Amino acid sequence: MIVGIGTDIVQVSRMTALLGRYGERFPRRILTGDEFKKFSVSKQPAYFLAKRFAAKEAAAKALGTGFGSGLRPCHIGVGHTERGQPFLEWQGRANELVRILGVSRGLLSLADEKEYALAFVTLLAEREGAKPGLSLERALNSLKLSGNGNGVTD
């Protein structure tokens, strides 16, 4: 069953401008530790960031929250299999949300063309009769009740 879908497009020149303005502060804020290591040796850092940022935005949209309720870009990671297939990695608040929503698998597709990077995310659950909208409300309420809904990051 599909729990959520999300898509995002990022202009590479926007990432170039952010890198010029903030230097490493911007990638350190949005990337996971593993992603930052790869970013540090990337030959095309703006393209690297554009793809990662698009993937993180698309995943946040698929979760139904966007970036809010304590969910930050660094809670969503992007990795690749040995054959190059991209996949999502959940950390912190994102990990809590996918667990509460019953997400069993996240599918990620990435594309780029000249000045743009695009990401599409589909979140799947194995359980029958799941109600994603109700689950999202329950997830957000659960985070508030556990003291994690105040925007404090893990």
UniProtKB/Swiss-Prot annotation:
Keyword Zinc part of the UniProt annotation: no
The enzyme's E.C. designation: 2.7.8.7
Reactions it catalyzes: apo-[ACP] + CoA = holo-[ACP] + adenosine 3',5'-bisphosphate + H(+)
Domain of life: Bacteria
Pfam families documented for this protein: ACPS (PF01648)
One Gene Ontology cellular component: cytoplasm
Known cofactor(s): Mg(2+)
Subcellular location(s) per record: Cytoplasm
GO biological-process terms attached to the record: fatty acid biosynthetic process
Molecular function terms, GO-annotated: holo-[acyl-carrier-protein] synthase activity; magnesium ion binding
Binding locations of Mg(2+): 8, 57
Family: Belongs to the P-Pant transferase superfamily. AcpS family.
Protein role: Transfers the 4'-phosphopantetheine moiety from coenzyme A to a Ser of acyl-carrier-protein.
Name of the protein described by the UniProt record: Holo-[acyl-carrier-protein] synthase
